[in-house]
Amino acid sequence: MAFGTGEHATTAMSLRLLERLTRKWKHGWSLADLGTGSGILALAAKQFGAGRVTGIDIDPRAISIAKANARLNKIENVDFRLGDLRKWNPTGTRDVVAANLYSELLIEILPKLKPCNWLILSGVLRRQEDKLLRVLRRNNIDIVNVKHRGKWIALLANCSRAL
């Protein structure tokens, strides 16, 4: 099974941050779920009222599982795509970019994440937190909330100043 059952600390924290961020938003906002795995964040975004949702993963099995999860949950209009985030060239902006990835990859692809309003980043170990926060601040990304669970962190950041 592809990563992402909703029970892992990073996924659970990301879901909570996404729900809290968007609970009062009007329907139709957009989300890119990078490293979508089983598609849980993308599918939850649709349930929370997102309009345009894209899930990207490098693993073909993950994309198949994400599509199957969408069918099982009767959730439509989620664009799951196979892709290498290092080669990804986003078009337009997203209201939210969620990325549950290891910190080195998050830092590497950070310039591609900035055309958005909000970032939800997870998959980062506590011992890597300071480095990631420094890089975000250097890029004019404002950290709004950092969650900790066990050895993991997840964070919500506003990147509107970084554009």
Placement of each model-derived feature along the sequence:
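Glycine-rich beta-to-alpha transition loops that act as phosphate-gripper elements at the mouths
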Residues: 1, 34, 123-125
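Conserved short-loop catalytic and cofactor-binding motifs
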Residues: 2, 54, 120
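Active-site beta-alpha loop architecture of Rossmann-like, nucleotide-cofactor-dependent enzymes
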Residues: 2-4, 104
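Conserved SAM/SAH cofactor-binding pocket of Class I
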Residues: 5-86
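S-adenosylmethionine
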Residues: 20, 58-163
